[in-house]
């Protein structure tokens, strides 16, 4: 489906039926284009395939500044939601699209939830469950390990190139938002696992296709999609019997939280995550502060005696 043609037809429809300013039309275009870019990054190629979870993840990342570069204000959130609702009403009425995953979302103030993350023990339980004799399991373990080691977005992981990895130095070059590059180091276990995947799994998938530079591939040798990585993470959490629903961004949250828990400088974490705005990274300090408060409340004798 050609997303851009649908957007152009939507904007023409808006211009016909409304008398709003050019600024209003530009706001519609900007809001919807950002959403369409998110769909493309996640290899979602049809409006019918967009789920409520996709929309929820999109607004979570938009709200927290992962998309757009800075955390969203209440008024900006309301405008973005209104734009997408108008766009989907147009799709339903004029383009034969039956799905409307935006309908259930409400405007008003944003309830800022702290990022969900795994504890270190939960992460290790999930990582250590994989059978490293099976090529698919090797690949899946390597995907999750690399995302956790480097704090990658799912689209960054899916697009990771072999040529961007310096195994000797333990660095990889990530192509992030707006094609901005950043260098991220990884720990020795991650290095060993990448080498193990390259030597024992990737070639199995590449037997019938021409060699290319994308690191992670599906069983047909084609570049793996962000949606496939999402499903891999969900299944890994279920197989590890973790009590929470796992999604790729939770692994990125875990990276940031564990780094700050262990004394990493906030600005270094900002750089590693590829955040333009320090405020986007600061939300993780609230997570660590809440955890510290819980420890004090549970362990300090004066806190315990006050209960």
Give the ranges of each region predicted by the language model.
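Conserved catalytic core of the tyrosine transesterase superfamily
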Residues: 1-307
């Amino acid at each position: 489906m050609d997303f851009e043609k649908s957007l152009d037809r939507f904007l023409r429809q808006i211009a016909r039926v409304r008398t709003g300013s050019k600024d209003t039309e530009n706001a519609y275009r900007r809001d919807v284009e950002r959403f369409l870019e998110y769909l493309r990054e996640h290899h979602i190629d049809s409006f019918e395939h967009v789920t409520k979870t996709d929309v929820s993840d999109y607004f979570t990342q938009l709200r927290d500044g992962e998309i757009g570069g800075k955390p969203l204000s209440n008024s900006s959130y309301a405008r973005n939601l209104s734009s997408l609702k108008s766009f989907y009403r147009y799709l339903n009425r004029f383009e034969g699209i039956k799905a409307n995953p935006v309908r259930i979302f409400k405007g008003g103030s944003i309830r800022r939830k702290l990022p969900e993350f795994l504890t270190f023990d939960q992460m290790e339980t999930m990582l250590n469950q994989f059978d490293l004799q099976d090529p698919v399991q090797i690949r899946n373990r390597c995907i999750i390990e690399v995302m956790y080691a480097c704090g990658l977005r799912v689209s960054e992981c899916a697009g990771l190139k072999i040529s961007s990895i310096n195994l000797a130095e333990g660095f990889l070059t990530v192509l992030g938002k707006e094609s901005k590059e950043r260098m991220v180091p990884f720990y020795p276990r991650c290095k060993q696992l990448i080498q193990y995947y390259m030597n024992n799994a990737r070639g199995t998938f590449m037997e019938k296709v021409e060699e290319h530079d994308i690191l992670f591939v599906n069983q047909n040798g084609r570049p793996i999609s962000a949606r496939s990585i999402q499903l891999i993470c969900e299944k890994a959490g279920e197989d590890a019997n973790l009590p929470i629903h796992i999604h790729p961004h939770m692994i990125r949250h875990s990276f940031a939280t564990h780094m700050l828990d262990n004394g990493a400088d906030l600005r270094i974490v900002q750089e590693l995550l590829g955040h333009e705005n320090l405020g986007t990274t600061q939300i993780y300090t609230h997570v660590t502060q809440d955890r510290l408060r819980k420890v004090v409340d549970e362990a300090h004798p004066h806190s315990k005696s006050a209960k």
